[in-house]
Amino acid sequence: MKSYFFILVWITSTIHSFGYEAMHEKTPVGTIKILNLPKRTALEASSKVSYFDENNGLFRKLFRYISANDIAMTTPVEADITPGKMRFFVGAEDLEKKFTDSNEVKIKSVPTIKVVAIGIRGGYTKARFLENEGKLYHWLSENQKFEKAGETYGVYWNGPFIPGLLKRSEIHLPIQKKQNPKKKNQK
């Protein structure tokens, strides 16, 4: 019975990974590391409520948009938590296509960014987000080279139909190098 379970897990996770262009590599589960993310074109849906209160509504808005405009799905998607926003990224093959804002989706240019990231396994819950966000803030408090440069956001690698125990995600905290403090008595 155990072997059937592991075969099912392997098949489900393998099938899900086919066909999607990855915008960057996954951060290994439990690992905290610095990533330099490139400039990207995003499709963004927003809500007045928290991402965790949206019940996949943001995902559905974006999915309808990419389906209507024949844009390939990429992974991961990003989500600002409060207020809720979700971003799909446009892959290399679709960048030349002409697409415009809709009532539900806005096109955004996302600049290059340096983040500290933590890899996570499990369902996409507020409790899991807050627990791992705390680990990033602890890392930042222990690291004297960097300071916060923006708000944390979720990075989700799997769609809503993948079982929670198979899901992978990350939390990113934008950072920048600390400015050298001016020395007293320096002219």
What does each of the following model-derived ranges do?
Residues K2-K187:
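A solvent-exposed interaction/effector surface
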